[in-house]
């Protein structure tokens, strides 16, 4: 007697070949960018180890420091009173290089094979991350060494984001893009969490390993990328998606930001892409100015500048804030800071779902930004009153701060990079993504720098700066929110008209 089909085999057959390949690409690019973020996180965990109060620690027998020196166990040159400014300079070296490199990276990403470009970037990123940690074992105490390594790492890390967004955009159409990319974008928070946990293992003993281990993992992932990344569905005989609906159904002006893909009604069917692999002449890569003329690019880019300023200030300074204000150990502060990233995962998925359901990317971002401002104020004043309040407030702040950031860098970037005004030229995706994330990276560089300069005057002032940036991010979306509200009224009017008929 023959048995019935095994449940596992039944499950495998339930999905088409195209679905399996799409799932594989989604998972692979998820792991790729998680590694990028994992390699960025250790510096925020190790900061509290580079400069610490050593007054209660037992001095080694051969110590030559002055008996009144309370920073004898800190790592020179970060053992002086200006350590916050020096740590801010190290952060900013990476972030400024990243911001500058991002504008160039998108141009290269449109013109070079993504597999080579991405895998080379990951291997180099792993190398420079490890070199930072080797400064501990090589007993390097020169500021220029750490700054130079951060600059090089910032430049090579720009290979990541435009490449993975372009690759995912090649495989997935517009249908449920916000939800899919909301889940996928959790790689940012997953990478931050992994980076925090891995760095926390060695931060109190050999902090150099906090960089070397993530660096090695990132380099290995670069080799895996070279072996397995598939740029286009056509490369493995899969069906390419379409990015737009039937033109006859588009009754409104496609140049209107309300009717652009980030705010249009998304169908459940995969839509999409004319890719460069299709038959016929290959479309030219879009110019920088051409990408800026796409409706919505400038507004969302400037909004992301301030949203990313807030997010990256938390990324780089939250563990030190918890260490100084709540008086946890370096490892406990690093572990607790991961809750902000847990909230970021939830926020990214929520923002994607809500924007898909309401067809309103800008309004979703604006509402979350409005709610984030009072939550940051409350976290600063009551978040450290107990472990329970700290956990709850960190998760809520993570949801509201990282939700808009996640939505803009994923679904919005993909929507604008395949805008109707491009007339089927999907080669704009990497450039648009680079412009949006590059502009955001300027804010990412400014945030930690300002935090380093302002924190000596008190942490309250740092939070006032973050709240101000959050409000500015919201204001920059007002025009698009107004357009989306008009679109809702029009849609409701049509719906009422149909019911009367």
Swiss-Prot record:
GO cellular component, one term: endoplasmic reticulum membrane
The organism's taxonomic lineage, starting at the top: Eukaryota, Metazoa, Chordata, Craniata, Vertebrata
Organism: Mus musculus
Gene: Slc37a2
Activity regulation information from UniProt: Inhibited by vanadate but not by chlorogenic acid.
Keyword line: Antiport, Endoplasmic reticulum, Glycoprotein, Membrane, Sugar transport, Transmembrane, Transmembrane helix, Transport
Induction description: Up-regulated by cAMP in macrophages.
One Gene Ontology biological process: glycerol-3-phosphate metabolic process
Name recorded for this polypeptide: Glucose-6-phosphate exchanger SLC37A2
Superkingdom field: Eukaryota
Tissue: Highly expressed in bone marrow derived macrophages, and weakly in spleen.
Subcellular location per the Swiss-Prot or TrEMBL entry: Endoplasmic reticulum membrane
